[in-house]
Amino acid sequence: MYHKVLVPLDGSTLAECALTHVKTMVQEGFAREVTLLSVVHVDAPYSELYGAHFDINKMKKAYFDAAGKYLAGVQARLGTEGIQAKSEVVEHDPPAPAITDYAAKNGLDLIVIATHGYTGLKKLMLGSVALSILHHSRTPVLLIRPEASRS
């Protein structure tokens, strides 16, 4: 049913908790294709606002290169377990709409994303990419708590 799975990653250990479940899904035949997605946001620093020269294109390239290198490392780790994944880096702010749009435009069946599981004031203060994806995605979403990846 969920053959094409999207895993948004931001470079954090928390985000990678989703990989444990995706690996199981692939190994048990529930998923065939895995796409790793990193969303970067490149914004001019405050110095640019005050007339200091800043090469935004150089900064953008550095962000894309770092995200691409990170995803290549994740792909390599998955590859050692026999799981092939493709990866892509996109630019957008905030990240949630980029993730939901990417899933819809590329015909993906499931978004698997880790979440802190914050509630109440913590959720309001910190925001939640996972919650925004859950509320706005037309693609089914599987939320993974870090504790679940350890079991």
Put a short name on every predicted segment.
Residues 1-54, 77-79, 83:
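Small/aliphatic-rich secondary-structure junction motif
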Residues 39-69, 150-151:
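Acidic, proline/glycine-rich short linear motifs
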Residues 24, 76-111, 151:
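Structural beta-alpha unit
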Residues 104-151:
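Gly/Ser-rich helix-loop-strand patches that form or flank binding pockets
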